[in-house]
A protein has these predicted regions:
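Acidic, glycine/proline-rich low-complexity segments that act as flexible tails and inter-domain linkers
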Residues: 1-62, 97-98, 109-110
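A generic alpha-helix surface/boundary motif
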Residues: 3, 30, 47-52, 68-69, ...
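General N-terminal targeting signals
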Residues: 22, 30, 56, 73, ...
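Generic alpha-helical structural context detector
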Residues: 37, 71-72
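Conserved alpha-helical segments that form or flank metal/cofactor-binding pockets of metalloenzymes
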Residues: 45, 62, 66-68, 74-100
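Short acidic/histidine-centered micro-motifs embedded in hydrophobic/aromatic stretches
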Residues: 52, 72-73, 87, 104-107
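Alpha-helical ds-nucleic-acid-binding substructure associated with the helix-hairpin-helix region
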Residues: 99-122
Length: 122
């Protein structure tokens, strides 16, 4: 698959792009990938998107376990294989049971959901 917007080579980054990229690399993501590659064309917007995404994924009130469960349910619903491949192992690491992950992968409602997981799933 070809990128519609080719990545900007690091040697061509402006000072603002370099600073925005470094903020993401130094943050919890640890690397510049996914939507941040084309967003680098607008470093100010990229900064706002990064802050929103960081909050939703890492610091929201529902916690990391339920956040990862929501990501898996959404990834499966919309056939987002890359998101699934990235987040299924993370979900297991943060406490989503393997049988829950497997059921979602099969597009089935997991049989043994905790109350808070059922709220997210349903």
């Amino acid at each position: 698959m070809t990128d519609r917007l080719r990545p900007i080579p690091p040697e061509d980054w402006t000072d603002a792009q370099r600073a925005a990229a470094q903020d993401i690399i130094n943050g919890p993501r640890g690397a510049l990938y996914g939507p941040f590659v084309p967003l680098l064309r607008s470093p100010e917007l990229m900064g706002y998107a990064q802050k929103l995404g960081e909050y939703l994924r890492y610091r929201s009130a529902i916690g990391v376990r339920l956040s990862e469960l929501a990501i898996l349910v959404t990834a499966r619903e919309w056939d987002q294989q890359v998101e699934w491949a990235i987040h299924a192992p993370i979900a297991q690491q943060v406490g989503v049971p393997p049988d829950v992950i497997d059921a979602i992968a099969r597009r089935e409602r997991p049989a043994a959901l905790l109350v808070d997981e059922a709220v997210v799933y349903d």
